[in-house]
Regions:
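Solvent-exposed beta-strand/loop surfaces of large extracellular or lumenal domains
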Residues: 356-382
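C-terminal beta-strand-rich structural cap/linker in extracellular carbohydrate-active enzymes
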Residues: 376-414
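Catalytic domains of carbohydrate-active enzymes, especially glycoside hydrolases
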Residues: 47-68, 135-139
Length: 414
C-alpha cells in the first residue's frame, strides 16, 4: 500500500509545498511528561533533566514538556482574555540550562503551547512565541486548544478555526518550526503543502482513556477513517493501564488494551512523531517489552496491509526507512482472534529472525493486560504465522536478517 490517502489526493490536484526551500524535517520519537504525580510543579529543571537522561539512555529523540510556562494555575477556566504567556517560563524551569543539558545528551527539547482555546490571543503572541523558540533552540511545538474557542465560541472545525490552524502552520514554517496540533480539525492533506505540519491529534487519542475511555474497537476504526487524512499523534506506549495506579479515585477504570496492543499501535497508528507516553518508572518494570519501543522505527520505505476489517482488526508490516529492518503490528477489538501473518513481502533468498512480542495465554485487557511473552523464530518469505491475539490485544514483531549462527536452536515458521 503506497497511498497516503488525502495527502496523495491533494498532491494530484496540483497543490505543492508552500515552502519549497523548507528545511529537512526529521521524524522522531519523544518522551511525554504528562502522566506525572500531581501536587507540585513537575515541569522543573531537575525533574526534566531526569527525563533527558532517560531519553538519552534509550535512544529517544526528544522531550515534550507540558506546564513549563506561566498560566497553568487556573487554566481550565477557559474564559481569560490572556491565559498563557508563551515566552515566559516558571522560575523553576531554566530554559537555557535545559537546552544546554539536552544538547549535551543528544536530545531535542519540544515546545508546548496550550492555548486554553484562546486562539485569538495565541495569534497575537505567535511571532513572539516562535521567536522565543528559535532563540532558545526549539524546533518543534505541540499546540493545544482545550475548551470552547475564544472569543466567539467557534467550533474547532469552523471556518475561522480552519484559517487559524493554517495561519499557525504558515507562521511556524517562516520560523522553521514543526507543528503537532492537538484538538485540531481533521486533516485534509495540507501536511503536503506545509511539510512542517508534522502531525495532528484530531480524534480521540490515548489521553481519552482517562476521560471515560476508548472502546477496544476504537483503534481498529481509526486507520480506516481518521488516518486517511494524515498522521495522527495518538500517544501510545502505556504499559501501566490501571488508572488507579495514578488516581485512587478511579479504582475500576483502565486503558482498554493489553500492554502488547500498546506496542502494536506504533505500526497501526503511523506518525512521523511518536510519543513514549508512560512513566519511565513503568518502563523500568518491563525492560524486555520496552526494548521494542527502543527499536521501532517512525519513518518507513514501504508498508503492506496484511489483513484488515474495519472496527474488528488490522495487521500491517512496514520496512524501516533506509534500513534492512521490518516491523509488524497487529491489533484486535474486544474479541480475541487468531491473526494470519504471511511474510511474502520480505526479500527473497534470505532468512530472518523475528522477535515476537505477544499477549500471554491468560492476557485480557480488563483482567490481565500486562501478561505477555517474547520469543524468537526464524522466518522466510514463505513463512505464514498463526498468531493468537487476546481480547483487545495485539502482536508486535521486529525482523532482521540473520546468519546461521544467530538462527541456531530457533524454530523456523513454515
Amino acid at each position: 500500500v503506497r497511498s497516503r490517502g488525502l495527502g496523495d489526493v491533494y498532491k494530484r490536484q496540483g497543490k505543492t509545498w508552500a515552502y519549497s526551500d523548507f528545511y529537512q524535517a526529521k521524524p522522531g520519537i519523544t518522551d511525554y511528561t504528562k502522566l506525572k504525580p500531581n501536587g507540585h510543579h513537575p515541569a522543573n529543571t531537575a525533574h526534566v533533566k531526569e527525563y533527558i537522561d532517560f531519553a538519552s539512555a534509550h535512544g529517544i529523540d526528544g522531550i515534550l514538556v507540558e506546564g513549563w510556562n506561566e498560566g497553568w494555575e487556573d487554566w481550565a477556566s477557559y474564559r481569560k482574555d490572556r491565559q498563557f504567556l508563551f515566552n515566559k517560563a516558571y522560575p523553576d524551569f531554566d530554559v537555557k540550562e535545559l537546552q544546554r543539558y539536552a544538547k549535551e545528551k543528544g536530545v531535542q527539547m519540544v515546545m508546548h503551547h496550550e492555548t486554553a482555546a484562546n486562539a485569538a490571543d495565541y495569534e497575537r503572541q505567535l511571532d513572539e512565541a516562535f521567536q522565543f523558540m528559535v532563540d532558545n533552540g526549539y524546533h518543534a511545538v505541540k499546540t493545544g486548544y482545550v475548551g470552547y474557542i475564544i472569543p466567539r465560541n467557534e467550533y474547532h472545525s469552523s471556518q475561522w478555526m480552519n484559517n487559524h490552524y493554517i495561519h499557525v502552520a504558515r507562521r511556524a514554517a517562516d520560523y522553521k518550526v514543526m507543528v503537532n496540533s492537538h484538538e485540531a480539525v481533521r486533516p485534509t492533506g495540507l501536511c503536503r503543502t506545509y511539510p512542517n505540519w508534522l502531525a495532528q491529534e484530531s480524534a480521540r487519542g490515548g489521553e481519552f482513556e482517562t476521560m471515560g475511555g476508548n472502546d477496544p474497537d476504537h483503534t481498529c476504526i481509526l486507520p480506516f477513517t481518521r488516518l486517511k487524512g494524515g498522521p495522527m499523534d495518538y500517544t501510545p506506549g502505556i504499559f501501566e493501564t490501571r488508572l488507579s495506579y495514578y488516581n485512587g479515585e478511579k479504582p475500576n477504570e483502565r486503558v482498554h488494551t493489553t500492554l502488547v496492543k500498546q506496542m502494536a499501535l506504533y505500526m497501526t497508528m503511523p506518525s512521523p512523531i511518536q510519543m513514549v507516553a508512560d512513566l519511565p518508572s513503568n518502563y523500568a518494570r518491563f525492560p524486555d517489552a520496552f526494548r521494542f519501543i527502543e527499536d521501532v522505527a517512525v519513518d518507513w520505505d514501504n508498508s503492506w496491509y496484511l489483513e484488515a476489517e474495519p472496527g474488528d482488526y488490522i495487521t500491517v508490516a512496514r520496512k524501516a526507512k533506509g534500513e534492512d529492518e521490518w516491523f509488524v503490528g497487529g491489533i484486535t477489538d474486544e474479541n480475541s482472534r487468531t491473526a494470519t501473518i504471511p511474510f511474502s513481502w520480505l526479500p527473497e533468498g534470505k532468512q530472518y529472525i523475528a522477535t515476537i512480542y505477544e499477549d500471554g495465554k491468560d492476557a485480557d485487557w480488563d483482567t490481565n493486560p500486562q501478561s505477555y511473552r517474547i520469543r524468537k523464530v526464524v522466518v522466510t518469505p514463505k513463512s505464514v504465522l498463526k498468531q493468537k491475539l487476546a481480547a483487545s490485544g495485539g502482536v508486535a514483531i521486529s525482523i532482521k536478517e540473520a546468519d546461521k549462527a544467530e538462527m541456531k536452536g530457533l524454530k523456523t515458521i513454515r
